[in-house]
């Protein structure tokens, strides 16, 4: 799917299933195509301001290794890996099913460790 966006400049949502169509709907495709033109490591290295990189070790969408690549590209950045935090900044103590369910649980709070991390970074 990603390759089709990059190579062909779009995907016809009539040929893909409803779940994928929701993610790759035509209205989002221009954004996704432009987003693929950027390399996060190159972009973060250009920054001349303090940088805080936060990742959860329970993130289904962005692996810790991706945050580590950003840190390598910007050695003076602060990297914090928050235990049990997922992509939605929620603390997940269970496995994959609990993590997936959290995406629809608006009552699950943002992990306090995230808030403390951001606060300390701003105040420093």
Could you describe each region identified by the protein language model?
Residues 1-34, 38:
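Accessory cap/linker subdomain of secreted extracellular hydrolases
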Residues 47, 53-55, 59:
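Short beta-strand/loop motif that positions the catalytic acidic residue
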Residues 58-62, 87:
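Acidic catalytic loop of the alpha/beta-hydrolase fold
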Residues 78, 85-124:
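Catalytic active-site module of serine/aspartate enzymes centered on a nucleophile-bearing elbow/loop
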Residues 25, 33, 37, 60, ...:
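Solvent-exposed, acidic/flexible segments
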Residues 49, 62-73:
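Short alpha-helix in the alpha/beta-hydrolase fold that links the catalytic acid
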